[in-house]
């Protein structure tokens, strides 16, 4: 019986050690699972935060992009309207009575004579007669000749006889200068 007691003791000791090892393994496994769950939760929270941050960035980019599109469309609409105003003003000037154009040609030629002593005058077809009458009728224009028709809406283009100087007193030039200096005012009137 002594041997059986020793065997039972060894067996009991083995069972206790096995139970202790099993308990330690279960505790370690539980700790590993808990740590894994904590780490997984941290990763999930970080991923959610990153996704939220990226979503916010995308939203900010999309809103900024949409604002740029709206602003570009608004500026294009403003430009279209300003172009229509410019075209309308040019048409109104072109449709003025013939005597107004004749007077303008005469005055522009007088101004040309102050800057050029002799030159060649170019006008559009409508203003040809007025230019020829001014050249033949004004002493200050005795050094001027009519050079022909050019593609302008009105006014005159005068070139010095030596070709060194050209005065562009066309309606387009005057309108362009007025438009450039008044564009800001026109925009404020039209668009506030």
Swiss-Prot record:
Alphabetical list of Gene3D superfamilies matching this protein: ATP synthase, E subunit, C-terminal (3.30.2320.30), F1F0 ATP synthase subunit B, membrane domain (1.20.5.620)
A GO CC term attached to the entry: plasma membrane
GO molecular function: ATP binding; proton-transporting ATP synthase activity, rotational mechanism; proton-transporting ATPase activity, rotational mechanism
Function comment: Component of the A-type ATP synthase that produces ATP from ADP in the presence of a proton gradient across the membrane.
Subcellular localization: Cell membrane
Family annotation (InterPro entries): ATPase_E_C (IPR038495), ATPase_V1_Esu (IPR002842)
Biological process terms in GO annotation: proton motive force-driven plasma membrane ATP synthesis
Protein name: A-type ATP synthase subunit E
Family under the similarity heading: Belongs to the V-ATPase E subunit family.
Pfam name, any one: vATP-synt_E
Keywords linked to the UniProt accession: ATP synthesis, Cell membrane, Hydrogen ion transport, Ion transport, Membrane, Transport
Record keyword Membrane present: yes
Topology of the protein relative to the lipid bilayer: Peripheral membrane protein
Organism: Methanocorpusculum labreanum (strain ATCC 43576 / DSM 4855 / Z)
Subunit structure comment from the entry: Has multiple subunits with at least A(3), B(3), C, D, E, F, H, I and proteolipid K(x).
């Amino acid at each position: 019986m002594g041997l059986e007691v020793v065997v039972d003791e060894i067996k009991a000791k083995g069972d206790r050690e096995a139970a202790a090892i099993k308990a330690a393994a279960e505790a370690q496994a539980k700790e590993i699972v808990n740590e894994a769950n904590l780490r997984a939760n941290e990763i999930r929270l970080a991923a959610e935060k990153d996704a939220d941050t990226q979503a916010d960035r995308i939203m900010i980019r999309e809103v900024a992009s949409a604002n740029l599109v709206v602003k570009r469309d608004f500026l294009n609409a403003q430009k279209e309207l300003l172009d229509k105003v410019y075209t309308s003003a040019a048409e109104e000037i072109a449709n003025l009575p013939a005597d107004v154009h004749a007077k303008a040609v005469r005055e522009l030629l007088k101004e040309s004579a102050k800057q050029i002593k002799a030159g060649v005058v170019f006008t559009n077809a409508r203003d040809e007669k007025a230019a020829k009458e001014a050249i033949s009728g004004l002493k200050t224009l005795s050094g001027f000749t009519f050079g022909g028709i050019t593609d302008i809406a009105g006014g005159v283009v005068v070139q010095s006889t030596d070709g060194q100087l050209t005065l562009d007193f066309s309606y387009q030039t005057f309108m362009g200068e007025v438009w450039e200096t008044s564009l800001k005012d026109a925009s404020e009137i039209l668009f506030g």
